[in-house]
Amino acid sequence: LGAGKVGVTLAAMLEYCDFCRDTFLADLRRPSIPDLPKLHFKSIDFTDDRRLESFIRGKDAVVSAAPFFLNQKIAAVCSKTKVAYFDLTEDVETTAAIRKLAKRSKTTFMPQCGLAPGAINIIGSSLAHELPSVRSLELRVGALPLYASNSMKYYLSWNTAGLINEYCRLSDMLYNGRRIQGKALEGIERLTLDGTEYEAFYTSGGVGTLCETYEGKIRDLNYKTIRYPGHRDLMKFLLYDLNLIDNRKVLTEIFDQEVPVTETDVVIIYVNVVGQDHEGIHQRSFAKKIYGDHLNGRRYSAIQLSTAAGIAGVLEIFSKGKLRSGFVKQEFIHLKEFLKTQWGSRIYSPDAGASVTDLVR
């Protein structure tokens, strides 16, 4: 549900998956995508309860790639029709509401799929399990333009409302073993990867359910978004000095009208774990850069490929009957299992070097 950037990318990926027989894509208007043998498009207004229920009924699984504020409605219909539910939301309140629905469901409910939350949680929890005692788990993710000439050093590559939402809400974390919340845009740090300098700061949602899972088990756990240096200060100016945090609709409209959209982007993933065993203190890390590529004769951005691959891998695991009913956390899946999936391995494997185009031939 949702034929935006991620929805159409997921549909294109599922075309090559043996576990998927048919893909049904729904939105108000058909997107500009090639005709694919498995793909069936349906025009639906998601606020029309009757048509939404009719479309969902009888399907094996529903993926909501719709705006996060529609997910509660979609999840409720899935609960009613006993259809498995997955989504891409990073919104904490939406996830909490869906979790309540999942308590009385006999099918799988797995929100927060995709990149962050999503694959980053699978990676982080799997690294943490390699050490018997973990001091810290640091999750760092950024979707950045490869080239940027504006003052923000940023171009749009995904949903603007979701982006601004992450900059405005509180960030969950563990500090000295306790669950606390930090203010988005704070906790700024500098890091250098492959000779390029970046900044990272707290944003909302990316940690998913990891704080709940590891409270009392890991001393310090946090998630930060990676940007080019200087971006954070300009966002603080817009949100707090101009008080657009109380008028996010205006800020969203300004971004959509004036900030260019790019498909020439890079997704940066960096996870660092420090812990100890009987031999001493050890560090485990995962670093990956994902770039845009072509699929079905069309170019997809890095954020499209990384987000869609996160959910495609989860769907493959679900198709094998390996996900339980009710609410399922991302960290329920081990990285080794995720990297065995078709798209998990192609996009997220540290050794993946071939292009997406080569891999699907």
Question: Predicted regions: what is each one?
Answer:
Residues 6:
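Hydrophobic/small residue at the entry helix of a nucleotide-binding pocket
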Residues 56, 60-65, 85-87:
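N-terminal Rossmann-like NAD(P) cofactor-binding module of classical short-chain dehydrogenase/reductase
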Residues 67, 76-96:
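ADP-ribose/adenylate-binding Rossmann-like module
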Residues 130-361:
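C-terminal catalytic/substrate-binding lobe primarily of soluble NAD(P)-dependent oxidoreductases
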Residues 19-35:
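NAD(P)-binding Rossmann-fold cofactor-contacting core
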Residues 1-2:
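Conserved N-terminal Rossmann-fold NAD(P)-binding element of oxidoreductases
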